[in-house]
Each structure stands twice: as C-alpha cells, then as structure tokens.
Amino acid sequence: MAAKDVRFSADARDKMLRGVDILADAVKVTLGPKGRNVVIEKSFGAPRITKDGVTVAKEIELADKFENMGAQMVREVASKTNDIAGDGTTTATVLAQAIVREGAKFVAAGINPMDLKRGIDLATQAAVKDITARAKKVASSEEVAQVGTISANGDKEIGEMIAHAMQKVGNEGVITVEEAKTAETELDVVEGMQFDRGYLSPYFVTNAEKMVAELEDPYILIHEKKLSSLQPMLPVLEAVVQTGKPLLIIAEDIEGEALATLVVNKLRGGLKVAAVKAPGFGDRRKAMLEDIAILTKGQTISEDLGIKLENVALPMLGRAKRVRIEKENTTIIDGLGEKADIEARVGQIKAQIEETTSDYDREKLQERLAKLAGGVAVIRVGGATEVEVKEKKDRVDDALNATRAAVEEGIVPGGGTALLRAKKAVAELKSDVPDVQAGIKIVLKALEAPIRQIAQNAGVEGSIVVGKITDNTGSETYGFNAQTEEYVDMIQSGIVDPAKVVRTALQDAASVAGLLVTTEAMVADAPKKDSPAPAMPGGGMGGMDF
C-alpha cells in the first residue's frame, strides 16, 4: 500500500479552501446575463468556449492533491444540481464557496463545527421553505419562453423555440437537442407516435415521388410473432377488405408467402396494405407493442394471451386517423385509444421511471412516455463554426432543463432576488446555542452571494445592489436587471428562475459546504520520490589506446 500524506485542522482546511476558491472563481465568472465565457483546452480539436458552470467545473483538476479534494467536492455540488434541476450549477457553486469561506473563518475562531453545521442546515431549510412558498405556477407559453430566454443568457430565439416545442408535444413530451448541419437553428416536431421501423417492401409505397406510404383511417393489426404463412391471416384480411379501409400490419417479421401475397394484393388494388417490423427487442418490444395497442384501442395478438391469428375479429384491431410510413420510420397520428387507458399507461411508465436505477432504461422509458403523451420535438442548433454550435447547444440544454423545472415547481423572481428575499425567513430563526446561531449567520450572508456576483459581472458594485433591493420593502419581486442595469419588477420584466433550480442549488451547496466545514483531517497519497537514474557505463573499450 502506498504511503499516505495526512494533514490536520487549519492546515487541511486552508488547502481545501484554496481548491474551492480556484474552482469557484473559474465558474462564477459565467454567472448572469453579463457573465463572461471560459475557454477550455481540448486534447484534440479546437478549444471549447462555454458559459455553462458544470462544464467548466468538470474540466478542473488541480496538481496539489489536497487542493484538488476541495475543488472536487464543489464540483460535486455543480454535478448534483445539474442532475436534479439541469441548471443553476453556477449559482450552486457561488453559494457553496460563500458558505465554506464564512464557515472556515468561524471554525478558525474556535466555534464548534458540528453546531455550525446544524445552524447551516436549519437556515437552509427555512430558506427552501420560503422559496417554495413564493413559487408561482407557470400558466402561459409566454412565461415558459421567459424562463428559457433567461437560462439561455438572454437569447430570445431559444426561449421562444422551447416554449413552442413544449406547446406542441406537451410537458411530458420528449424534446431533444442536436447539432444542425446548417447555420440556422430550427425546430422539428413529430406529432403522434413514431418508431424507427420502415416499410418491409418498397411496393407498399403510396406516394412514389416521396417514397412514403400513407394510410388514411386504417385498421392496425399488432402481432407479436413472425408471420410467414398466409392461411392464418385470411379471415382478418377478408374482414378488412369488406370495410374498404386500409390495413397496417405490425409484426416481429413478415416473410415468404405472407409478404408476397400482401404485395400482390396491394399492387392489384384489392387491399390497401402496408407491413412494418415491430420496434425494439425482447421485453421492450412487448411493452412497445402494448403501448401501440393502447394508443390505437387495439389488442396485441399474442399466443401468451391465448389469442390465435385465425380467430382475430375487427374489434381487436387498432384504429388511427392516419399512418405515415417512410423507409426508416413509422408514425401513427391520432390513435383512437381511450384517454383514460392512455393516462393509466402513462402513470404506469412514470412509476417505472421512478423505480429504475439504470440511466439507459430511464431514457428508454421516457421515450415511451413521450410517444404516448404527445410526441417528439427536435431542436437542431446551428452556427457558423463548430465552436459556436457547441457553445449554443450548452445554452439550449440549460434552457430546456430550466423550463422543465419551471413547469414542475413554478417560478420565482430571477437574478438572485428570491435568495435575497429568503433572508427574511432565515433572520427569524433564533437559537439559544451561540454556535448554531453562527451557522444561521453564515447562510444569511451566503444568500447575498449570487446577486453580488451577478452585479460584479455586470460591472456594478454588489453591496449597493443588495442594499437597494433590501431597502425596498414595498414589492417582493423588486430586483436588479443586470442586462439593462435597472431596478425593476422582476416578474413583470420576465426575469424569472425556476423555483426547483434555486431550491436545489441552495440545498446541494449547503449539503457539501456543511461537510467541508466539519473536515478536521485529510488523507492523500504521498508523492512518490523518483530514485535517480543509474549512471551510464563509460564509453570506449577499456585498456585500448586510441
């Protein structure tokens, strides 16, 4: 086992604090509408330019192991906030630094760290309760756009695009962000349920120019197994022909005689039909077929359920207003499923999302949820150069996460105002234990840190801004617009933050900072002393005169 280097009390805390400061100082320059960019060197390709706090934090690794431990703890704050709320990472870092700095001063002055932490926790709970109580539900698409705009650093186009996407696919819908091949940023919305399987034969195409098959008001046969012989299918095919409606067959595979007969029927005009393979694999395929069945008010024809293909009647088939089948994708638009059944299925998938521990499974479940709940929107981010596209994509990701959080828990006045107003609730806390009271005092001061940093990044003195907002007791939403350097009603001006983001940033910062303040010893691998290289043997041949 390698030898260890151990540091204690003040020595350990000083080193740790230096690491916290290095990371936090690099991250906090990005805060607010006038925050600066950070350029990150990449081992290959162009450097990356970003204003995303967590991206900066993840890149920082310090040479000194003890300083690095402090930096990594604060990096954990940014990562955790990013995982839960998807935004607010810089705010969380600024808060953590403020709590650790103040805490270290008190500990150096001889205050009990454990009581100090208790005070920090009490004050944090009071502030979180206050922020949650102030939250205002997001009612209009305009408010969604405002949240997106603020989080995208004042880029109105991004805010409006996200609001439009949410309007189209609903709050449960999937919105993905991709890099575009062009300079324009655009929104592409797929309504209905889409899965990545196309037609089994190009002969099913109804529009030869676009190479797509479009079926209006079709019946949908959902079959779990392979279809290779025609005989079992005849009764259901004849029943559909009688109605004069088209038929879509979704099965594990369709081959041989069955496929040939369907193609011949289609070409002769006897039956408008198209066939596609079922999406997914294994158990996931079963679940997705069941989703399609619920969406279209049909039944999955499965021998597990004791239903044989020859016994299938028309009521067992699904229905939809329209189905569009391309070479790679199939989209079912306006399935005729019962709303109550679809909602029950959505609830079931949500419960599975809560339970799963695998990120991959969670992602797949969310995709299924979105397809059932409304649709999929893709924001394609464009720019003149690759560096610009990556920087913009970071901002779109942040804005998207912020708007989701806003819809979930509501909005509060932005620009650090909500944290500053929460001081009132924290100031009411009183403890008989002086050391606990000191912890409350630390949080009181830390709650000012984000607004001070936003002001500083805008080139304004933070203390003046804090004083002016605190003195205005008439309006709870009165704050500082760093973009225009004016004092305004934050909600009316559309400067809002999601309550979830503000709450999570404070909770995560206080949690990690509390642990750092109570640190008394640090252990790291001792640096290895390299042994000197052996001397080179003398050159030439001994005993020979040249």
Swiss-Prot record:
Forms a cylinder of 14 subunits composed of two heptameric rings stacked back-to-back. Interacts with the co-chaperonin GroES. ATP binds at residues 30-33, 51, 87-91, 415, 497. It comes from the Bacteria. Together with its co-chaperonin GroES, plays an essential role in assisting protein folding. The GroEL-GroES system forms a nano-cage that allows encapsulation of the non-native substrate proteins and provides a physical environment optimized to promote and accelerate protein folding. One of its GO terms (cellular component) is cytoplasm. It is found in: Cytoplasm. Its EC number is 5.6.1.7. Its main location: cytoplasm. CDD domains: GroEL (cd03344). PROSITE patterns: CHAPERONINS_CPN60 (PS00296). Transmembrane segments: none annotated. This is Chaperonin GroEL. GO terms for molecular function: ATP binding; ATP-dependent protein folding chaperone; isomerase activity; unfolded protein binding. Residues 537-546 have a biased composition (Gly residues). Residues 527-546 are annotated as: Disordered. GO terms for biological process: protein refolding. It comes from Methylorubrum populi (strain ATCC BAA-705 / NCIMB 13946 / BJ001). Belongs to the chaperonin (HSP60) family. InterPro entries: Chaperonin_Cpn60_CS (IPR018370), Cpn60/GroEL (IPR001844), Cpn60/GroEL/TCP-1 (IPR002423), GroEL-like_apical_dom_sf (IPR027409), GROEL-like_equatorial_sf (IPR027413), TCP-1-like_intermed_sf (IPR027410). Keywords: ATP-binding, Chaperone, Cytoplasm, Isomerase, Nucleotide-binding. It catalyses: ATP + H2O + a folded polypeptide = ADP + phosphate + an unfolded polypeptide. NCBIfam families: GroEL, PRK00013.1, PRK12849.1, PRK12850.1, PRK12851.1.
